[in-house]
Amino acid sequence: MHIRILGSAAGGGFPQWNCNCRNCRGVRDGSVAAQPRTQSSIALSDDGERWILCNASPDIRVQIAAFPALQPARRPRDTAIGAIVLLDSQIDHTTGLLSLREGCPHEVWCTQMVHQDLSEGFPLFRMLSHWNGGLRHRPIALDGEPFAIPACPRLRFTAIPLRSSAPPYSPHRGDPHPGDNIGLFVEDLDSAGTLFYAPGLGEVDEALLEWMRRADCLLVDGTLWRDDEMLACEVGDKLGRQMGHLAQSGPGGMLEVLAKVPAARKVLIHINNTNPILDTASAERAELDASGIEVAWDGMHIQL
């Protein structure tokens, strides 16, 4: 299984266009040892030729340009993206579909809750129906059964409902439903390599831990170091848990969760611009290094 990190930042990217926190200011003027990042999205493949896009970032055009395998140029108009999987209906995970309209129709795999949000609150399915057949919805069931996507037939996907939040525009933002957010457990039938992918993760219970323990590689929510980080940096008024993100530090935080899991690779993705782990010289980054936890970067490639 080939895993390509197309984008590793949370919504807004890094640096965020209107942010002057220590990290954003520092990456602009060179005073912080960090590299810019686009908004989170990954691509998966079973052969390195046909790819499944997991979430469609607003930065998708730049991400495709940075990864030539997604534009093989075999004909006048071409793409190696054979399907798209949406793990939620967040704006920073779906807006990229608008930039892919010239390649419609696209097979878009998502839950009924995500499809509902993207048909009503942010009606991408209806908007894009005017472009060559638009988006063809392929429903993702929450029955715990693995399913195949024809674009990469040697991969098996299992959708895992997560406790997180629907986007702010959703009519059930304050009333979570199963399927608002999912994680993916992906298995390669040839190599037997396994991936657990959850860029938006608000809570980890014992059932979810069991899925995480089965994975060779974890690619999980790295949004915030502290639950009150947005308030401390004076750039927001919500706690991480109110936004559906489990912070890395503190009791029950992601560091404690990952310490319970034997995966060979533990990687944080969807990193907010305020998170001190973006600074490679920070004490927080040193703590991750000492724990064997990696920080995803744009262009990172993992093979399982």
From Swiss-Prot:
InterPro entries in the cross-refs: Metallo-B-lactamas, PQQ_synth_PqqB, RibonucZ/Hydroxyglut_hydro
Coiled coil: none
UniProt-listed GO biological process terms: pyrroloquinoline quinone biosynthetic process
SUPFAM superfamilies xrefs: Metallo-hydrolase/oxidoreductase
One Pfam family it belongs to: Lactamase_B_2
Pathway as given in its UniProt record: Cofactor biosynthesis; pyrroloquinoline quinone biosynthesis
Keywords, in A-Z order: PQQ biosynthesis, Transport
Gene3D superfamilies: Ribonuclease Z/Hydroxyacylglutathione hydrolase-like
Family: Belongs to the PqqB family.
Function according to Swiss-Prot or TrEMBL: May be involved in the transport of PQQ or its precursor to the periplasm.
Protein name per its UniProtKB record: Coenzyme PQQ synthesis protein B
UniProt source species: Pseudomonas paraeruginosa (strain DSM 24068 / PA7) (Pseudomonas aeruginosa (strain PA7))
Gene that encodes the chain: pqqB
